[in-house]
UniProtKB/Swiss-Prot annotation:
InterPro entries assigned: aa-tRNA-synth_I_CS (IPR001412), aa-tRNA-synth_Ia (IPR002300), Anticodon_Ile_BEm (IPR033708), Ile-tRNA-ligase (IPR002301), Ile-tRNA-ligase_type1 (IPR023585), Ile-tRNA_ligase (IPR050081), M/V/L/I-tRNA-synth_anticd-bd (IPR013155), Rossmann-like_a/b/a_fold (IPR014729)
List of residues binding L-isoleucyl-5'-AMP: 554
Entry annotated with the keyword Ligase: yes
Comment, domains: IleRS has two distinct active sites: one for aminoacylation and one for editing. The misactivated valine is translocated from the active site to the editing site, which sterically excludes the correctly activated isoleucine. The single editing site contains two valyl binding pockets, one specific for each substrate (Val-AMP or Val-tRNA(Ile)).
A GO cellular component entry from the record: cytosol
Name of protein: Isoleucine--tRNA ligase
Annotated gene: ileS
Organism: Streptococcus pyogenes serotype M6 (strain ATCC BAA-946 / MGAS10394)
Amino acid sequence: MKLKETLNLGKIAFPMRADLPNKEPQWQAAWEQAELYKKRQELNAGKPAFHLHDGPPYANGNIHVGHALNKISKDIIVRSKSMSGFQAPYVPGWDTHGLPIEQVLAKQGIKRKEMNLAEYLEMCRQYALSQVDKQRDDFKRLGVSADWENPYVTLDPQFEADQIRVFGAMAEKGYIYRGAKPVYWSWSSESALAEAEIEYHDIDSTSLYYANKVKDGKGILDTNTYIVVWTTTPFTVTASRGLTVGPDMDYLVVKPAGSDRQYVVAEGLLDSLAGKFGWESFETLASHKGADLEYIVTEHPWDTDVEELVILGDHVTLESGTGIVHTAPGFGEDDYNVGTKYKLEVAVTVDERGLMMENAGPDFHGQFYNKVTPIVIDKLGDLLLAQEVINHSYPFDWRTKKPIIWRAVPQWFASVSDFRQDILDEIEKTTFHPSWGETRLYNMIRDRGDWVISRQRAWGVPLPIFYAEDGTAIMTKEVTDHVADLFQENGSIIWWQKEAKDLLPEGFTHPGSPNGEFTKETDIMDVWFDSGSSWNGVMNARENLSYPADLYLEGSDQYRGWFNSSLITSVAVNGHAPYKAILSQGFVLDGKGEKMSKSKGNIISPNDVAKQYGADILRLWVASVDTDNDVRVSMEILGQVSETYRKIRNTLRFLIANTSDFNPATDTVAYADLGAVDKYMTIVFNQLVATITDAYERYDFMAIYKAVVNFVTVDLSAFYLDFAKDVVYIEAANSLERRRMQTVFYDILVKITKLLTPILPHTTEEIWSYLEYESEAFVQLAEMPVAETFSAQEDILEAWSAFMTLRTQAQKALEEARNAKIIGKSLEAHLTIYASEEVKTLLTALDSDIALLLIVSQLTIADLADAPADAVAFEGIAFMVEHAIGEVCERSRRIDPTTRMRSYNAFVCDHSAKIIEENFPEAVAEGFEESGK
């Protein structure tokens, strides 16, 4: 027998290398075979409910790292709730209608307008479902636990029917109407867009300063006066029908030197404009308030059939321009709102494809709208005072990445103004994480216009509206309920397969159709109405879910998207928000803080991360970042996270190895019988349990990450395990000292494995497989630990905090001795502590082997007054380091004066000799194989 065989080195079957890319799929297969999600739901039956509603990602392409952040975050929350006494099902969803899928088919050469519509829609449907399958596999690879066999998909007939019922309820309350307001119009998509489908980019535009000649000055301005206006969209001058001034702003009539014309501009902008126009000097002829100029009539710059009226508007500012805004009600929301008050014509001179229409005039007809600036300049002639290129923020279609325009076209709207205050009241009742989300959503709802819900596309849910012979729109409850039932049975495809009369209830009549003839709407609903109705199609429809949901969790862009649309529909129909709380997260940027894009080559694919590092590394990254703000990720950052993971894994590996002979049923030592330092570690660990429990409640994953890393690296590795290994290795296998520490080891191991399961489910499942005494087959079926408190806990923590200060001081003294070549490693030291009475009292109270804790072979405690001059001194304490006396025990590696060669060929100290002689009589009788001496 070899001497080292008398040590309790533990069985280390748990591998140091995680090999996550290969092992994770094996665990996922095991979970699926064991129907783990289903079993967890069965365990939680009857418990309090926690229902997170999954915002549906768009079904197109593999998932990106933003999807991973979102889904992993949701999984962490739902797993933690499921293990903490809540019935917490997770139903994933997908958004499957809309333009992107039409664009994919177009790129494949499929031409919608040249084929049967039903056939085309079926192709869209099949493509969407294929993308659902692709993304489902991607999410499952990340270890996300969900009801994958029963997701909600917005193209499902049941979902479409429930969406129609939401529309019908809003229509019944009068919230759906048709109007010709200006809307965001995408010429590249040939469709209206909602605010949530807009993104802004900085672009260069040519802006023009020009003048309208006064035609009727109403006794205030004479006819040789010109009103100066500014535009950044020259094409809209073709539809200009008014000039808007600020009612309380001051305007001057000035006559430039050498000119026979006089001009009206805002007083606050005159100096800057004079420079732009080359007016070296000018004479001020008069001053007027904007309100005085109301109803003055001017000539259109070139269209002699058009007059432009001076009107008043509160949206006019002195930030730029001339203080006078040319007003084209067909091309702007403010223009429309102020223009309708004065009954200005709502002229639209651009068609759905962005081409100038015939009513723009023969010089413009057929030209692309943003190519007509040279024509406008030519038509203005000497009315043009200046032109300049400006850089400004401009709206783009978020899908096609092309600029859009405001354009008045007949559309269907959902009113927000009718119940805006009700929505705002509901926002104030909602909990927000982070708290600033409340202000953000509140302001968006407060300031938004009515919602354009119609789209001029094919792949989507039809608007269930019929038209009588006289043009009356029909959307009564009887009709929408019937359409909903048809969709539930057949899917929305039936809308395109049947005539209007066959979609109406049997025997339906209407006074507007004396001949019984009806037509149907051909527009579809905005896809935000699809997902915005999910509270009804999912949370309100499924027995195992509830409405309102406990939590909606999405990226911060969803304040104007899903959070917004869901809130509007829910309050409209039921008078309350669809959620009790909202958690929003920042965007994922690359390692340099830049937006990810294919062109930059900085995209991080979750699938690539899973192949290189493993999903648990990506999950740990999610827990490590502050998602209240934008977060960064790169392969280098993930490499750093992997290093942290390795430290956690290897620390837990040590605990597994050193509890391999520990049976918790027979070997556990009661808290009252633990050693003082073991009690301290138990208290510290339970504080960690409390911290993690609270952080899960607050959805603060980063707090969990920081607390776990600090505990593992500082409290365990750098302190407790640093000296505890000398006990568990060296003491007799069944000794009280060893079982005390193993009790703490095992308690930490089991509980931290449970606590980390929501974040690192694959790793903790592997650890759990080594814990043979735990009854649950999978850690995911276990319950979260509950933090305990202990008698005199605060006093114990205070005493050990003081010791930690002493320990740091002692380590400094030992380091100086190392540098002076007095010792090599700390076990070569004889440390003398010269202590004040206060420190002596502390050391006595600790009731511990201080030499063991400081990892020195010999320790002496003396009076502070006796400290030599060359001692390393601190307030109330000093240290002296000398080389320990004696020889190194081959078994404990400590220097001990009792170390000598024993008759059984072992060069050991008396303490090791006693352990050997009591526990290994055969080795004593036969002698050990070899000795270093």
